[in-house]
């Protein structure tokens, strides 16, 4: 088995309010930055997985995202090789 680097990105679904993103967006002007038109906060997870091949590593990361890394009711996620 080989080690494969995989990335899982998790974001709130567009229709879900993002209070953390709103707080950061509102703070930008007070720090001297131009306001952002849109700002949303998510998670970026980097994994090194032992698997037979890249497809098996992606499938394993997909299962991890579905069951633990993301809440599919309110979050979307993507899985890719690093």
Locate each region found by the language model.
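Long, contiguous binding/interaction regions
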Residues: 1-82
């Amino acid at each position: 088995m080989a080690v494969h680097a995989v990335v899982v990105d998790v974001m709130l679904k567009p229709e879900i309010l993002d209070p953390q993103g709103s707080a950061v967006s509102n703070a930008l002007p007070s720090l001297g930055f131009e306001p952002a038109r849109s700002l949303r906060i998510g998670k970026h997870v980097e994994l090194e997985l032992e698997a037979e091949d890249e497809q098996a590593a992606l499938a394993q990361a997909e299962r991890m995202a579905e069951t633990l890394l993301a809440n599919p009711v309110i979050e979307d996620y993507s899985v890719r090789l690093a």
